[in-house]
């Protein structure tokens, strides 16, 4: 047995005297001495390893301290950014309300100044950040290239820093902070396998930092860090919950909250600047947009058996959605609360701006050339806010790589074995689920809301022209000037020409309002028609303003003589369909078209009051209709997911467009070859009537219930179950203005002079807006 001990000790380690002619003798004392030497050797090795492990533990503790400090600073910056965004939003809301009270020439100057304030170029941003870095470099008093370095001498105390110190932190955290979620997964994976060995090896009270700092270290003390990771996750969840609650409150309270304000008080709709085809990315982090209290109220205030937006027991009676609940939209924010004005470099813009422009400049909005996952954190513009801490925290590190500090940060990260990343986003696949991932945003890194769809189905974000929101005939915003308390859900509205009377259709009657005197709170007359329990679905005035045609959830159409001393029904048209969903009048006032619940389009001779023809083609209810200005072509949309055009001279179908969603509304541009379609899936699509090209617009969050073109043809409005009124530029859909009401907006109309908009909503009222140019 003792002889076998010689096999334990390689001769290369402890050579012994050896004579080839004599046998090898091994005594017990020599073996003990050899064992003692080996023990001392192992003890020395153990001591050396222990020192190295203690050194590593010390480094880990130091790095963990740095990590926590960066996290606290990032959180502080996030809070500061949120605060500044809120300040900017409120200031811009004040500006939007004050500007209309200025004289016309001053209005133009102020509006131009505000617009200039939004045009921040990359050169200006680089100069501003360079000044901040230089000031910070001088204040720290050391010569290192990055103001916040891993060396303790360059670290500020773990407190919330002022906004001025953000640049250095952003630069370095773009490399360190972006991967904050990776160590947690890595440590959990190794935790079970290494726990037993780690427990018997080095016992240290230090807390483990990021697991990827030393890739060659196989046996790490992960037990302590695992608990720290759980604690870290818990803190992040608490922060997220706090931010989500704030965001939802802001959505309800800081937009245009009709329920919390005097209905008669004029208010400007949020005057954002959607020149750039981008929108807030924070909303996109949520998979299912929660139903706000306002939408719940709107649903509860709308009779489920009658309203256009809810399902009925019989699908043939009322056009309905395939689903009673609004489709969750994550690719479109709540307009009015999350659409952010874009910053686009303007060629030739001088670096200096006037004091008003500089005071209105939106902070922390850095355009980034990367596509969506590497975009900037969405700043809150005139009516935007940060609603998701996840997006805000991740986006906090995504500063433009053109800044020199980012390169230094990458070098600092490389010293710790990390790849120099720019704003790694662990949830980038969740950002824009409804928009193909191969689509990049416009310059600025924000996902677009307007897309051009080519003939082969390729979607590309639309670059808006410089005159998208300026020029004759393009409104700046709309101001609510009157509320007409109808008393029932208002499913139909129309405005007289000239603009004096508004007709609102509810349950069993049409009420007539004189809006030339805003003080009038009562209708001037009430036209009882259909049955008392049946909803009016459409009412149309003949061009002379003397005749009103009313249709709804009944088989008859009522023709009213408004020129009589007392308005009276002069005729009724009876069809075989149980309901009429929409009406259109020919330009010569001789023919009326009605969309029937059985899918047919009935053509009525108004002079002889007879049915002269039926267009058959829709396999489900025909829900919406419009007619070309020359009276030769008719467009209809249906619940069979199709839009069809009809030749009125030949009485035949011309075209058919198939969609994947039910069609709830449409409008034909009075001056051009464009047809806008509002759908159940919350999209608005603008089709060219002779070419396969089209535009797809994403700002609504639920069904698009009504749509109307301005008579100039340069813009149109759409309303939806998401309580929103959106105004769009024809045809590419730049968002001109948005207004949020307190309930679903079921119907709308625009006056002939394009100066007034009227909407009918689920909270039993109609709202009159003045369009401000």
Swiss-Prot record:
It comes from the Eukaryota. WD repeats lie at residues 485-523, 531-570, 575-614, 617-656, 658-697, 699-738, 740-773. It is found in: Nucleus. The modification Phosphoserine is found at residues 208, 212, 222, 245, 250, 269, 273, 292, 321, 323, 419. Gene3D superfamilies: YVTN repeat-like/Quinoprotein amine dehydrogenase (2.130.10.10). In all tissues examined, mostly in brain, and muscle. GO terms for cellular component: beta-catenin-TCF complex; nucleoplasm; nucleus; transcription regulator complex. One of its GO terms (biological process) is Wnt signaling pathway. Keywords: Acetylation, Nucleus, Phosphoprotein, Repeat, Repressor, Transcription, Transcription regulation, Ubl conjugation, WD repeat, Wnt signaling pathway. Residues 205-274 are annotated as: CcN domain. The modification N6-acetyllysine is found at residues 237, 281. Residues 183-202, 215-252, 273-289 have a biased composition (Basic and acidic residues). Residues 1-136 are annotated as: Q domain. Phosphorylated. PAX5 binding increases phosphorylation. Ubiquitinated by XIAP/BIRC4. It holds the Pfam family WD40. Residues 275-452 are annotated as: SP domain. Residues 137-204 are annotated as: GP domain. Residues 1-22, 140-162, 182-360 are annotated as: Disordered. Residues 317-328 have a biased composition (Polar residues). The modification Phosphothreonine is found at residues 318, 325, 327, 334, 340. WD repeat Groucho/TLE family members are characterized by 5 regions, a glutamine-rich Q domain, a glycine/proline-rich GP domain, a central CcN domain, containing a nuclear localization signal, and a serine/proline-rich SP domain. The most highly conserved are the N-terminal Q domain and the C-terminal WD-repeat domain. Homooligomer and heterooligomer with other family members. Interacts with PAX5. Interacts with LEF1, TCF7, TCF7L1 and TCF7L2. Interacts with ZNF703; TLE4 may mediate ZNF703 transcriptional repression. Interacts with SIX3 and SIX6. Interacts with PAX2. Interacts with TLE1. Transcriptional corepressor that binds to a number of transcription factors. Inhibits the transcriptional activation mediated by PAX5, and by CTNNB1 and TCF family members in Wnt signaling. The effects of full-length TLE family members may be modulated by association with dominant-negative AES. Essential for the transcriptional repressor activity of SIX3 during retina and lens development and for SIX3 transcriptional auto-repression. Involved in transcriptional repression of GNRHR and enhances MSX1-mediated transcriptional repression of CGA/alpha-GSU. This is Transducin-like enhancer protein 4. It comes from Homo sapiens. The lineage of its organism: Eukaryota, Metazoa, Chordata, Craniata, Vertebrata. The gene is TLE4.
């Amino acid at each position: 047995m003792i002889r076998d001990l010689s096999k334990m000790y390689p001769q290369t380690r402890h050579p012994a005297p050896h004579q080839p002619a004599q046998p090898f003798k091994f005594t017990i004392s020599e073996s003990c001495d050899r064992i003692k030497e080996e023990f001392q050797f192992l003890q020395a090795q153990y001591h050396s390893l222990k020192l190295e492990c203690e050194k590593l533990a010390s480094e880990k503790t130091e790095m963990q301290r740095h990590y926590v400090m960066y996290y606290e600073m990032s959180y502080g910056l996030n809070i500061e950014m949120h605060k500044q965004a809120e300040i900017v939003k409120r200031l811009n809301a004040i500006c939007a309300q004050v500007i209309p009270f200025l004289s016309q020439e001053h209005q133009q100057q102020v509006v131009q100044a505000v617009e200039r304030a939004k045009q921040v170029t990359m050169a200006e941003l680089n100069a501003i950040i360079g000044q901040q870095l230089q000031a910070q470099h001088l204040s720290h008093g050391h010569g290192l290239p990055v103001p916040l370095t891993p060396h303790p001498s360059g670290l500020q105390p773990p407190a919330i820093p002022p906004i001025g110190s953000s640049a250095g932190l952003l630069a370095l955290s773009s490399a360190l902070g972006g991967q904050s979620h990776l160590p947690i997964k890595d440590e959990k994976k190794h935790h079970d396998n290494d726990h037993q060995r780690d427990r018997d090896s080095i016992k240290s009270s230090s807390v483990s930092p990021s697991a990827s700092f030393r890739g060659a270290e196989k046996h790490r003390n992960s037990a302590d860090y695992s608990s720290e990771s759980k604690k870290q996750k818990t803190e992040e969840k608490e922060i997220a919950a706090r931010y989500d609650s704030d965001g939802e409150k802001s959505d309800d309270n800081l937009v245009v909250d009709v329920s919390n304000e005097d209905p008669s008080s004029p208010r400007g709709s949020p005057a954002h600047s959607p020149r750039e085809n981008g929108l807030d990315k924070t909303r996109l982090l949520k998979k299912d947009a929660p139903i706000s209290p306002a939408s719940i109220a709107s649903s509860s205030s709308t009779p489920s058996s009658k309203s256009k937006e809810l399902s009925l027991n019989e699908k043939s009676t009322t056009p309905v959605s395939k689903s009673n609940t609004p489709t969750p939209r994550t690719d479109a924010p709540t307009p009015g609360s999350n659409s952010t004005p874009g910053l686009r470099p303007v060629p030739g813009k001088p670096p200096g701006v006037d004091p008003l422009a500089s005071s209105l400049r939106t902070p922390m909005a850095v355009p980034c050339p990367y596509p969506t996952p590497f975009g900037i954190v969405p700043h809150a513009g005139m009516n935007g806010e940060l609603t998701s801490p996840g997006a805000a925290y991740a986006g906090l590190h995504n500063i433009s790589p053109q800044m020199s500090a980012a390169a230094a940060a990458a070098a600092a990260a490389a010293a710790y074995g990390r790849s120099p990343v720019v704003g790694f986003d662990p949830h980038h696949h969740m950002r824009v689920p409804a928009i193909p991932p191969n689509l990049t945003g416009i310059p600025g890194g924000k996902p677009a809301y307007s897309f051009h769809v080519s003939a082969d189905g390729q979607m590309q974000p639309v670059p808006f022209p410089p005159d998208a929101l300026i020029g004759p005939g393009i409104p700046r915003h709309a101001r609510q000037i009157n509320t007409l308390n109808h008393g029932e859900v208002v499913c139909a509205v129309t405005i007289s020409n000239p603009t004096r009377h508004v007709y609102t259709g509810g349950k069993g009657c049409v009420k007539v309002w004189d809006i030339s005197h805003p003080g009038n709170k009562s209708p001037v007359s009430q036209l009882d028609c259909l049955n008392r329990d049946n909803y009016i679905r459409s009412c149309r005035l003949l061009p002379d303003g003397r005749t009103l045609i009313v249709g709804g959830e009944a088989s008859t159409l009522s023709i009213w003589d408004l020129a009589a001393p007392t308005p009276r029904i002069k005729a009724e048209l009876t069809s075989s369909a149980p309901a009429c969903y929409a009406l259109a009048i020919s330009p010569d006032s001789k023919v009326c078209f009605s969309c029937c619940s059985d899918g047919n389009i009935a053509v009525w001779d108004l002079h002889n009051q007879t049915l002269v023809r039926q267009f058959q083609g829709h396999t489900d209810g025909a829900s919406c209709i419009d007619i070309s200005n020359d009276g030769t072509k008719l467009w209809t949309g249906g619940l069979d997911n199709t839009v069809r055009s009809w030749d009125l001279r030949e009485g035949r179908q011309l075209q058919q467009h198939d969609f994947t969603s039910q069609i709830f509304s449409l409008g034909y541009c009075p001056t051009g070859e464009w047809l806008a379609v509002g759908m159940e899936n919350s999209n608005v699509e603008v089709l060219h009537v002779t070419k396969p090209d089209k535009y797809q617009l994403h700002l609504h969050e639920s069904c698009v219930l009504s749509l109307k073109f301005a008579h100039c043809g340069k813009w149109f409005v759409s309303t939806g179950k998401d309580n929103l009124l959106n105004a769009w530029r024809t045809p590419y859909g730049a968002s001109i203005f948005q207004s949020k009401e307190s309930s679903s907006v079921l119907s709308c109309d625009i006056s002939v002079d394009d100066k007034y908009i009227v909407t009918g909503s689920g909270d039993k009222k109609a709202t009159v807006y003045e369009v401000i140019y």
